[in-house]
Amino acid sequence: TPTDSYLLAFESSQNVTFFGQTYVPDSVRSSVAVKGQGNSIVANSNSSGAAFPVYLSARIFPSRSSYKFDIKQEGRHWIRLYFYPIPGNNLTSATFTVVTENFVLLNNFSFKSYNGSYLYKEYTVNVTSDILMLTFIPSNNSVAFVNAIEVVSLPDILISDQAQGVSPTGPFNGLSGRALETIYRLNMGGPLITPQNDTLGRTWENDVKYLHVNSSAVNVSVSTTSIMYKTAVTPEVAPHFVYSTAESMGDANVPDDNFNITWVFKVAPTFMYLIRLHFCDIVSTSMNTLVFNIFINTDLASGS
């Protein structure tokens, strides 16, 4: 159980269950304080488009407003933000910024391009004090809003301070001082994993739509009961459901050295990316027979 766990449904009149997690009205959490002025709105429960209960209510901020979360455990925390521009409140034209004390999470973000659809954002930040401030700043002639917020502590083992650089190559230090935004989290060869099946409340989507050539890969799966964790690895790193499925080469006997499985992701070119790969050999029939290379674009990330 996380030491810090805030799951808030803003302006909800009751607890809300969403993918197995319970969100409480923000008004009942005494350890969460708000600074600034905010109007509240509540969507009609029959509102078209708001298919999930966590999106049925929201708080609107006409001016700069902050939420203060009391933190018991310093270190990495999830910050998850849920947005849905509830019809009839002119929120589809909202443009605003969301910041912590040290990081900009959203910068002059506009909902005009989302055409009234949902928006979910997930970040991890290293909290180094007993308070986390989350501030919403409307742009000129606009408002800010939010439907739900999660602030949840996570184990330090999940993200180390060092990673292996690819371009340029070499060790990269200082991850603990950086904020990270989740862009993609995939369950290779397996179904969607929702938060109730992940001890850290993560969502893992199926990888098929990112495959460059669908026929290049085949799904492999085993029972989750057969998955064994080493001492340094726990289900918090990734749940059994992740390690019990995989994508394997469509034909491992192809003589062409260029045969591969490739996934393609759209990314913003101006950012640095942390890529985490999870492996559990559920394919080999004998020891030390699984040999392959990993490339990121044209750079060799890991060689056999």
Language model features with spans:
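Compositionally biased, intrinsically disordered or flexible polar/acidic segments
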Residues: 1-304
